[in-house]
């Protein structure tokens, strides 16, 4: 029995890992040269509590349950997850009514610990909030993580359990027999399939169309962000939401897992043809500055590290579309996975395998006896106690050679990232946080290129930033 998962974002990665728990041949096809680089890469990194989703929605079905799975999942896969809680703040009695509605809705969704706090308690917990705040809905189960690392960790563990990972190939068609997909055709080859799971993010509607399956039309909703320096660590301790609107949860202020402060996102609907254009604008970033200053007046915008934008898949029904196709019997759609997609993904992965494939499609799956649930992260040596780090340097001097000074990433970490599959600068960046600091690679990029060249045994001119067409250097000036 062969299963093919299309798309290596957080949904595709976790579903692929879930499938490797069974006696299946599992293939994950990702068009980029690394996993977690599409919708997954650029979002708010919030593991939502689950109060924001209407109880009758598919989103509500998976949000609170997905949230509850993150503790164990982060321990198994060894990625950062911090359950820091969140505030939805209100500045007047009209906004208080919205907090009361969210509280009731969250209780219906099974979200534990929700409570509305008054001004003094809010400011005692978050003293840097705007002193004009009157109330806050406190959700203690909300958390933060690194979305791309969830995908990377899941895929690394799945590969340990037999996953075939195919990178740099786009799905271009399907071969069907008697209304079932038999082969998936890509830009470079073909793959036999008894089960196909479509997790292609913003392009999932196009993949479903190619297969002749049902779909909902998707368009990109752009969110622009500002990342501030770790010098502001502790400015806020929780995820700070404004009172939400009909369009979005609002523009947030939140800490990142490694100590920075993230601001955003905006919410701008774009035409379908802009699915692959996550650009920032002067107007969008100004909106982020304006709205977040209302939440935390002391924000220091002289400490900007990076601005960026992300695109999430929005659909007319504003809800997930997770179904077995009626027209293509072995084809599962996991699409329209807008917020809270990151939160819901672990629960959706179990649902797809246990409910849709085994129950609805009536495909019996046999669990492996030798499934390995754990994966270990790359050791970040500067986080070790000094004596332990010294011993590591004695064993391997590369553990003491700093390459990225902003985030204190060593040569050994970069070599380990390459050993685990990094073939591009972004492949190294998202596994190690090198080039994520204040200089954004201005100092360390050239050194990382040399390490990639040495370890891969290729000329530097062949190394890409991210995609097939993103060359970094054209050749040597001196030979």
What is the predicted role of each segment?
Residues 1-28:
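N-terminal Rossmann-like FAD-binding beta1-loop-alpha1 element of flavoenzymes
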Residues 14, 174-180, 186-264, 268-281, ...:
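Flavin-dependent oxidoreductases
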Residues 20-42:
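Glycine-rich FAD pyrophosphate-binding loop
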Residues 45-125, 250-251:
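Dinucleotide-binding Rossmann-like beta1-alpha1 core, especially the glycine-rich loop
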Residues 52, 142-144, 248, 331-344, ...:
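Glycine-rich phosphate/pyrophosphate-binding beta-alpha loops
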Residues 54, 61-64, 89-98, 137-156, ...:
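Short beta-strand to alpha-helix junction loop
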Residues 137-195:
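Helical element adjacent to the flavin cofactor pocket in flavoenzyme catalytic cores
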Residues 153, 248, 257-258, 273-402, ...:
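C-terminal catalytic lobe of FAD-dependent flavoproteins
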């Amino acid at each position: 029995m062969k299963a093919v998962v299309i798309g290596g974002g957080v949904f595709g990665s976790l579903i692929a890992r879930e499938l490797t728990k069974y006696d299946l041949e599992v293939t994950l096809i990702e068009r980029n040269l690394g996993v977690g680089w599409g919708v997954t890469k650029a979002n708010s990194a919030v593991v939502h509590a689950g109060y924001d989703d209407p109880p009758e929605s598919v989103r509500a079905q998976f949000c609170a349950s997905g949230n509850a799975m993150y503790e164990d999942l982060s321990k198994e896969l060894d990625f950062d997850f911090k359950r820091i809680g969140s505030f939805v703040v209100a500045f007047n009695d009209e906004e208080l009514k919205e907090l009361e509605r969210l509280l009731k809705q969250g209780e219906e969704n099974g979200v534990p610990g929700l409570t509305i706090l008054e001004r003094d308690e809010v400011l005692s917990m978050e003293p840097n909030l705007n002193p004009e705040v009157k109330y806050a809905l406190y959700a203690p189960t909300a958390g933060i993580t690194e979305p791309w690392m969830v995908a990377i960790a899941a895929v690394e563990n799945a590969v340990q359990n037999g996953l075939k990972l195919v990178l740099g190939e786009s799905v271009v068609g399907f071969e069907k027999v008697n209304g079932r997909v038999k082969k998936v055709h890509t830009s470079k080859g073909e793959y036999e399939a008894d089960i196909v799971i479509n997790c292609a993010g913003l392009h999932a509607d196009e993949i479903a169309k190619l297969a002749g399956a049902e779909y909902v039309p998707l368009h990109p909703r752009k969110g622009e962000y500002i990342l501030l320096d770790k010098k502001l660590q502790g400015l806020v301790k929780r995820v700070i939401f404004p009172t939400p609107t009909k369009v979005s949860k609002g523009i947030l202020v939140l800490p990142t897992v490694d100590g920075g402060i993230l601001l955003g996102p905006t919410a701008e609907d774009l035409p379908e043809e802009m699915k692959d254009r996550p650009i920032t604008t002067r107007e969008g970033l100004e909106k982020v500055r304006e709205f977040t200053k209302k939440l935390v007046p002391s924000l220091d915008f002289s400490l900007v590290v990076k601005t960026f934008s992300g695109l999430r898949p929005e659909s007319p029904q504003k809800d997930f579309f997770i179904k077995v196709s009626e027209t293509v019997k072995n084809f599962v759609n996991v699409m329209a996975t807008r917020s809270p997609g990151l939160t819901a993904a672990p629960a959706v992965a179990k649902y797809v395998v246990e409910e849709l494939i085994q129950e609805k499609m009536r495909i019996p799956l046999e669990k492996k006896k030798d499934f390995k649930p754990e994966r270990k992260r790359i050791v970040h040596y500067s986080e070790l106690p000094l004596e332990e780090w010294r011993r590591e340097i004695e064993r391997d001097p590369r553990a003491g050679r700093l390459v990225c000074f902003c985030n204190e990433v060593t040569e050994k970490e970069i070599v380990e990232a390459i050993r685990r599959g990094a073939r591009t600068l972004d492949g190294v960046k998202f596994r190690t946080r090198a080039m994520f600091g204040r200089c954004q690679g201005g100092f360390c990029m050239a050194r990382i290129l040399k390490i990639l060249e040495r370890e891969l045994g290729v000329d530097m001119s062949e190394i890409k930033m991210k995609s097939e067409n993103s060359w970094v250097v054209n050749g040597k000036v001196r030979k």
